[in-house]
Amino acid sequence: VPKCPKSGHRNTRDECSVVSEASGGAPRLERVRCGPEGADLVVRQRQVWLRSLSGLEPIDVIFRRLEDDRVDPMEVNAQGSAGVPGLLLAARSRGVGLANAHGSGVLEDPALGEHWDAAGAWLTGRASDYQQVWPLPFMPAADRSEREWTTWPSYDGTGLVDRAITLRLHLVASDKGIDVLQGGSARVLLPGDDPIRPTAATAKDVWVVGGTVAPPSLRRRDPLPQVDLIESVPTRAAEALFWGGRAMERAEILARSMEVVLDRTSGLVAAEVAEPWVEHGLDMLAAVAGVPLRSGDPGRAGATFASGVEALAKQLGSFLAEASSVREFFSTTAGRMLARLAASRAQLRWMVTEDGSPGPSVVDIARIDGRALETILVDLASLSGLWNESLVRGPAWRFGEIGRRLERAFGVIDGVSGAFGLYRGEPLSAMSWTAGDADDHRIDFQRQRVIELILATNESLVAYRRRHRSDVEFQTAVHLVVAEVHNPRAAASAIREVRHQAGRLGWERGVEETTGLLSIIEAASFESVESTAVVLTQVFAGCDRFARDVVGSYLAAPVDPRMMGRD
């Protein structure tokens, strides 16, 4: 942001008063911390509003840098999600002022550049004033001496080279004249770059100085007033952290499920040699990944793992996409973790063929996945620590935390339901593991292996061994991963954290909903798989309803907003 003297700021406000009729001559000048982007603004009743966590805030003037063809997808040939639908209608209806006005991009058209000097002289009638302005050198016709002042030294990684730049200065016009701001912006162009759309992300510092160098002087500056912009965080930021937190948590649950199954089977999970508990491990993995169970399929193991790898890559991609849109929330260290996860995602996408089928063999997939999964889990654990220790606990972060904890509860329920046969409609306690086999000890062994899978997937096996020091049992194991509020990996602990964050946001209905879910879990006995299935179904439905309420109550713009204090 260029430095703006007091006179420049005052003139900017004065000009905004002229541009904006909707503000009644008193527009607010507000710098939004993150953004705003097109998704942060919405047009209702022919007026523009900022979607913030405190509700919709009216926008009187928009200072835009977007190209003319990317302003309003409803009226110009915009592609993708660029622009704000209905913005030009609001501008024509005088519901918002645009600076710069739509169509002013023609001033930057290179084809018209050679005519602007003559146009300026004709408009002002003072042609002599332009004699002191350098004539524009039109490349490539200009000779080297004319091009030297358009190139600046730049470091390309090996040494200093000449690079062309695009320079942009900022001026504010008023009745008293024109104020030139003390700073500008410059972008370095790579060879072959279009000056209008440079690809390089390298910038240069720009200072605007007068014709003579003034002696250095120290001036005392009055401290700027402290303005808390936390309530003006665009809803997009909260939405990105909410969905990003969910994707990050689901990726961790999925990666750990795959690692646990691979570790306990040593990669030998072919259907013809697998023991019955392995089938339930694959059911658990399919449930967590959200892919078909493929029961009875001879190639089920390879297909399930290939689908799991693909699902993990998609979850990481979703998280990275959301995180990139709110990059200003994350520290530099977190940025390194995001880059490592992006590299891991690229590696995962090479593990399956284009049609989603597995690679050469199940063993090969297991070996490759084992290395990649360990790296992903370490990076996700590091990022989770940074999430809790480095991000400021503002409203946007709280929505991200709600998303993470909700997804953790969903993951626990999916894993338990899948492992114990609830998704295939054959609960573990009702199954005959081997036809005609009455060996109860053998059946107990199979059940214990399934229970160990659930505990290990939720990082609770060590806690179980330390607390009970006995063989794993269904009731105590399920209570530990579902109902134990002191176990941070348990569903109840996650829901309790959701309730806490809802309370900090002042959302009483959310507190009531989560309190009801905790009461259901607390009253459950988990004596059998069937009774557990009833509880898990109720809790899952309640969490899903809560997630939908979050989106509907906070992350969706109302159709008919009204400003407080205005007729």
Regions found by a protein language model. Give the residues of each.
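Alpha-helical transmembrane segments and their helix-helix packing motifs
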Residues: V1, N11-A26, E114, T151-D567
